[in-house]
UniProtKB/Swiss-Prot annotation:
Coiled-coil parts of chain: none
Organism for this UniProt entry: Pan troglodytes
Transmembrane segments: 224-248
Region ranges (Required for interaction with EZR, MSN and RDX and co-localization to microvilli): 251-275
Localization per record: Membrane; Cell projection, Microvillus
Leader sequence segment: 1-24
Membrane topology (Cytoplasmic): 249-275
Annotated protein name in UniProt: Intercellular adhesion molecule 2
Main location: membrane
Length: 275
């Protein structure tokens, strides 16, 4: 066999393997948006399109409410509404008997609308521990949430959360710290960040109202002994002064009553007995 014939056979065999049929058309299906985050009961517009010039059939598969807004041969535009849970939308087209599809992932979220910070106790001695608690009610998805605890501009602690049930949850973070002298002049705060960028959404921030501690210096044992001694002495002096005032008052009363008694008896004596 000549080299020309061998090359021709090789090319023909390659064409049969790689290109099995000239009538089988390759086409693509696209969906916009590919992913999106919406609030509960929200809606979104979805566009399904294909590169097939004359698709036989096409559409959007979903269990949610949908309305076909507009369409042409190569695309269809839908409104999907009443989205209450995470779901997958599927665009599909059939071209020359072959079906292709592409999915759009939809996530439901609730941003942090309330961030509650609590300091316990609020009156703390220097060197003693206290607890910082931050609570965010009704937020989802939890695995996209991060809570930051601040002392002034300093980040004391931050915490992320694992994937939870697909429903609004309450997120809580607790951190124990030790009070120092400057804490009485610093604001404590909490920041909630819900990052939905990976889900086709935005980033939501919500700060708590700032809180402050009341700081005092603890009293040493020697100072306590002095204070107790001084208080005891002052209390003794007070009691003694009260008793002396009472005794002195009784003495004056008796003296006055004794003088008045002699004069009254003198007046009652008959004239004959008076000198």
């Amino acid at each position: 066999m000549s080299s020309f014939s061998y090359r021709t056979l090789t090319v023909a065999l390659f064409a049969l393997i790689c290109c099995p049929g000239s009538d089988e058309k390759v086409f693509e299906v696209h969906v916009r948006p590919k992913k999106l985050a919406v609030e509960p009961k929200g809606s979104l517009k979805v566009n399904c399109s294909t590169t097939c010039n004359q698709p036989e059939v096409g559409g959007l598969e979903t269990s949610l409410d949908k309305i076909l807004l507009d369409e042409q041969a190569q695309w269809k535009h839908y409104l999907v509404s009443n989205i209450s849970h995470d779901t997958v939308l599927q665009c599909h087209f059939t071209c020359s008997g072959k079906q292709e599809s592409m999915n759009s992932n939809v996530s439901v979220y609730q941003p942090p609308r309330q961030v509650i910070l609590t300091l316990q106790p609020t009156l703390v001695a220097v060197g003693k521990s206290f607890t910082i608690e931050c609570r965010v009610p009704t937020v989802e998805p939890l695995d996209s949430l991060t809570l930051f605890l601040f002392r002034g501009n300093e980040t004391l602690h931050y915490e992320t959360f694992g994937k939870a049930a697909p429903a609004p949850q309450e997120a809580t973070v607790t951190f124990n710290s030790t009070a120092d002298r400057d804490d009485g002049h610093r604001n404590f705060s909490c920041l909630a960040v819900l990052d939905l960028m990976s889900r086709g959404g935005n980033i939501f921030h919500k700060h708590s109202a700032p809180k402050m501690l009341e700081i005092y210096e603890p009293v040493s044992d020697s100072q306590m002994v002095i204070i107790v001694t001084v208080v005891s002495v002052l209390l003794s002096l007070f009691v003694t002064s009260v008793l002396l005032c009472f005794i002195f008052g009784q003495h004056l009363r008796q003296q006055r009553m004794g003088t008045y008694g002699v004069r009254a008896a003198w007046r009652r004596l008959p004239q004959a007995f008076r000198p």
